[in-house]
Design a protein with these regions (language model features):
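A general structural signal for short secondary-structure junctions and capping/turn motifs
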Residues: 17-20, 78-80
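NTP-dependent small-molecule kinase module
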Residues: 70-139
Length: 139
């Protein structure tokens, strides 16, 4: 409990120092729905080509889904700042998630020779201000 509280106290300070030193900080939370997590878990159990992905944490994550979700929401409320915002990425569709994150980064950095029109971002896939939009996140 002490370590958690200390982490939550120190994280905003560290992020502020990074940003003040000129680092462009992107914080992405890759979110998967409970249903998709269960489907992937079953696939890892049954598909010999995916069994290498199995981890003991998979079953625990499903069992403690509500606890982990509440901890995630609390983290967003305590660590989502204008100088270091969180972005939630819906990852049930892995390809769409990856393309949208790449597009989000491209649109967010100052790179004049980049054609930003090819980097469209779907706001249903990349969600900004998650601490203010907890109702839109996977439960």
């Amino acid at each position: 409990d002490h370590e958690y509280l200390e982490f939550m106290r120190q994280t905003p300070q560290l992020e502020r120092m990074l940003v003040n030193s000129g680092i462009k900080l992107f914080k992405y939370w890759f979110s998967v729905s409970r249903e998709e997590q269960f489907r992937r878990f079953k696939s890892r159990q049954n598909d010999p080509l995916k069994q290498w992905k199995k981890s003991p944490i998979d079953a625990v994550a499903l069992q403690k889904w509500d606890e982990y979700t509440n901890a995630r929401d609390e983290m967003f409320l305590k660590t989502d700042f204008e100088h270091a915002p969180w972005y939630v990425v819906r990852t049930d569709d892995k390809r769409a998630a990856r393309l949208n994150v790449l597009g989000h980064i491209i649109r967010s950095i100052d790179c004049p020779e980049t054609d930003k029109t090819v980097a469209a971002v779907d706001p249903a896939v990349v969600i900004d201000n998650p601490g203010q939009r907890l109702d839109r996140l996977a439960r």
